[in-house]
Amino acid sequence: MSSNSFPYNEQSGGGEATELGQEATSTISPSGAFGLFSSDLKKNEDLKQMLESNKDSAKLDAMKRIVGMIAKGKNASELFPAVVKNVASKNIEIKKLVYVYLVRYAEEQQDLALLSISTFQRALKDPNQLIRASALRVLSSIRVPIIVPIMMLAIKEASADLSPYVRKNAAHAIQKLYSLDPEQKEMLIEVIEKLLKDKSTLVAGSVVMAFEEVCPDRIDLIHKNYRKLCNLLVDVEEWGQVVIIHMLTRYARTQFVSPWKEGDELEDNGKNFYESDDDQKEKTDKKKKPYTMDPDHRLLIRNTKPLLQSRNAAVVMAVAQLYWHISPKSEAGIISKSLVRLLRSNREVQYIVLQNIATMSIQRKGMFEPYLKSFYVRSTDPTMIKTLKLEILTNLANEANISTLLREFQTYVKSQDKQFAAATIQTIGRCATNILEVTDTCLNGLVCLLSNRDEIVVAESVVVIKKLLQMQPAQHGEIIKHMAKLLDSITVPVARASILWLIGENCERVPKIAPDVLRKMAKSFTSEDDLVKLQILNLGAKLYLTNSKQTKLLTQYILNLGKYDQNYDIRDRTRFIRQLIVPNVKSGALSKYAKKIFLAQKPAPLLESPFKDRDHFQLGTLSHTLNIKATGYLELSNWPEVAPDPSVRNVEVIELAKEWTPAGKAKQENSAKKFYSESEEEEDSSDSSSDSESESGSESGEQGESGEEGDSNEDSSEDSSSEQDSESGRESGLENKRTAKRNSKAKGKSDSEDGEKENEKSKTSDSSNDESSSIEDSSSDSESESEPESESESRRVTKEKEKKTKQDRTPLTKDVSLLDLDDFNPVSTPVALPTPALSPSLMADLEGLHLSTSSSVISVSTPAFVPTKTHVLLHRMSGKGLAAHYFFPRQPCIFGDKMVSIQITLNNTTDRKIENIHIGEKKLPIGMKMHVFNPIDSLEPEGSITVSMGIDFCDSTQTASFQLCTKDDCFNVNIQPPVGELLLPVAMSEKDFKKEQGVLTGMNETSAVIIAAPQNFTPSVIFQKVVNVANVGAVPSGQDNIHRFAAKTVHSGSLMLVTVELKEGSTAQLIINTEKTVIGSVLLRELKPVLSQG
């Protein structure tokens, strides 16, 4: 074989080694076939001879065969002396393979490896980067304390190597040296600090791993490199991403305040709506002050989001745990889709992902409810996957989906996998405990399972029924009698013990059956399982105390049998019971209370998820999987009450930028920044910090100069950002002035558009919009003042026009007022059009034009029909005389433009006054908000009152659960909106309708064919039926056979376009176009039967 036949590449060495090993087997001498009977003395002798040969081709062939043996898992350690002699070979291919071998066996053959240490040291200076890296790997694999100084020196030199591959191996060597000699920690930290500043993506993951192993508590080393790591994250290799994300998760928990308080505080602030002006002002101030996300916090969340699409399951899981632990709860929902995608992987990945989903679904059900069907069990799933899916389905069960889940569970009970069937029965029991509405249904189903042929199913059903009956023992005497009959057929000890315990607890309710059961059990006492024997003793004791005449002798007989039982637990229990229930001279005071002790009411067992207590472990870790703290686990710290100084993450700025700034500039910027809303500061500053490391550093440095601003990091104004870019553009020279300005303004516009998009996402209030309009004025003023005197007169006039136009436009923005009746008029909401990068003056002139001249206008209109149908909120029987009904008035909600208005009518059907009617505890899905009505002091007998509420359903038909309370009672009530009430009617032209419909195609379009009598397809009938189901507006149509309706969703403002196209005969096609595909599908299902019926 020639030396060029198998070129060895370090990157793919493992795969080639395997192939070489396969070829090697064919060249072994025939005697190797009888290796079982031959002597081991001459084993591998041919390889040793080839390694000692003078020919490089023979040596290379031998090394390939040896590496092939290693790849197959065979022991090649006896060849170490022969291999190590070739470490100084001049052939680069041989040297690479020798180092691969030495890395594997240097730790086992330390003495022989030490003989060649001088060769390794020389190799550290080799021109080939692979040889330098391999030499360092071998050197760090020789775990002998005597060479620690040599290793330390080699690591320091390698950390400054020009090759990032060598620096990467230096980071790997740090961990090995630290485990060999922990006393080198301080010197190694210096190397880690140096490598953390490395800008190569190849080094980042390895050095962070070294940091986690050596000094995970040295958070100060991360400060200056935090933004760089966030920006490099997407380009780092996959396994490095995992390590970095876990480290940054811990870092964020120590450096930023909790983002989870925001929603709670806003919800609390919304409770007291009608208050005095002073109180309202205090509430508004509170709403603004509590929490603003740090731009660096936002940077981390935004830069990890793309990694949810990674092909590596570990990366996706790492990002998911980061979002779970440090992102606002409203943003954590995006991880659910990615985690569900991982369920298509192999079973090992599924197991870990399902465990993490099980933990998440306990705290935030809403995240995974849309993907309920993804957790249905498949026949091909292994048992461990099936039980985890059952756990998740149980956690996601609620009143809305329990009927579907119970049908699914019925199928699972019939499974051939008995362990899975038993787990399903346990799940049904938990559902019955958690959802009281289906407790009786589940109990009846479990009783039916008692007649199942499979004994394991019957036994598990008995155990679960016993737990359910403890919740309501007085109501189910018949079930207890039925279970008593099963004692003759059931042999599973746990089930027999459960039946005996139930009979003993309810012996007074079944006085005739209990003694007979005890008689039967006395006959078979000696052959029963220990668990059953204990319950027989308990049953005898309880009957002795309640029915002594019939069972006294029987109990004494059982106690005598227990006295001589082989199990010491049985004997101990027998002595205890005898002393307690059979009075004698030696009996103490306890015997007086024997009845209270044995027949005391026991609390019902609490059926909880086994994943309930795992949330204190970081998701995705070994500790979370095992539910025990593993070696090396680093706990997540609690959020700090006050955020540490954010300036520690600022990188030093270059001196040039400081010198160029004109005098007085900083003052103007400071005064302008006072007008900025907090949400704008957060979004824009985080945007600019993500552009590049140098930009984030320089901008942070400028902020550090100002000294007066603590928390704000960067400028948030679109005009000031374009101004800064244009000023930096002028430095390049007068001839490039115009070009640089044009580019900088275009960039400023795109940045501002990004900022606006993020502001929409963060749902900024109207007050922040007012502030942003004042920012525009102030920033345009500062820009016009900073223009140099050399600018032309026409430019100055243009600036004045722009300023005047903006000032004219500013008063149009106004605060929302409760008494402002104009809010009920149709609100004009123009369709957003893409903004080209125009000059500021032209932009100002265009913005000053009236939008009414545009042909593309979509505005909210008044409802075409208001249904009078009411829904029962609280029945008078359930409400102890208080009845409540609600309906949807289809008018704009005065409590918020994203809320659906609801009117509730309360009736007092009693002959007494009902006092203090108010809303109590709210159990709303994630993201949903509710504005409650003011408490009603009293409601007279036969009196009635109507109140208004607002609920933001987040464009979903999820149920809003809350408590309607009086002075004495609280009642659980639910409001589930019809999908048609989540819409606002809009007025638009046929042209605009077709244009929008052309955009919303593909997955955004759902359709169905309707069959009905011709008289049901007249325009008036179609109109009446559609507006009765949904709050939509009619769109003028130029064709008689096509009827169009349009609306937008209340929460997000997404268009909902409905088309009814009449076909030949008695058929029609119903088409719905919308981005909200779920709502569109539900609306289609509701409209189809209404349009079909006569």
Swiss-Prot record:
Classification via SMART domains: AP3B1_C, B2-adapt-app_C
Sequence ranges of Acidic residues compositional bias: 678-696, 705-726, 778-791
Tissue specificity annotation: Ubiquitously expressed.
Any Gene Ontology biological process: granulocyte differentiation
Region described as Disordered: 1-31, 268-292, 662-811
GO cellular component: AP-3 adaptor complex; axon cytoplasm; clathrin adaptor complex; clathrin-coated vesicle membrane; early endosome; Golgi apparatus; lysosomal membrane; membrane
PTM per Swiss-Prot/TrEMBL: Phosphorylated on serine residues.
GO molecular function, one term: protein phosphatase binding
Residues recorded with modification Phosphoserine: 276, 609, 750, 752
Functional note: Subunit of non-clathrin- and clathrin-associated adaptor protein complex 3 (AP-3) that plays a role in protein sorting in the late-Golgi/trans-Golgi network (TGN) and/or endosomes. The AP complexes mediate both the recruitment of clathrin to membranes and the recognition of sorting signals within the cytosolic tails of transmembrane cargo molecules. AP-3 appears to be involved in the sorting of a subset of transmembrane proteins targeted to lysosomes and lysosome-related organelles.
Disease with which this protein is associated in UniProt: Hermansky-Pudlak syndrome 2: A form of Hermansky-Pudlak syndrome, a genetically heterogeneous autosomal recessive disorder characterized by oculocutaneous albinism, bleeding due to platelet storage pool deficiency, and lysosomal storage defects. This syndrome results from defects of diverse cytoplasmic organelles including melanosomes, platelet dense granules and lysosomes. Ceroid storage in the lungs is associated with pulmonary fibrosis, a common cause of premature death in individuals with HPS.
Family assignment from sequence similarity: Belongs to the adaptor complexes large subunit family.
Subunit structure: Adaptor protein complex 3 (AP-3) is a heterotetramer composed of two large adaptins (delta-type subunit AP3D1 and beta-type subunit AP3B1 or AP3B2), a medium adaptin (mu-type subunit AP3M1 or AP3M2) and a small adaptin (sigma-type subunit APS1 or AP3S2). AP-3 associates with the BLOC-1 complex. Interacts with KIF3A; interaction is direct; interaction is impaired by pyrophosphorylation of AP3B1.
Protein name listed in UniProt: AP-3 complex subunit beta-1
Gene: AP3B1
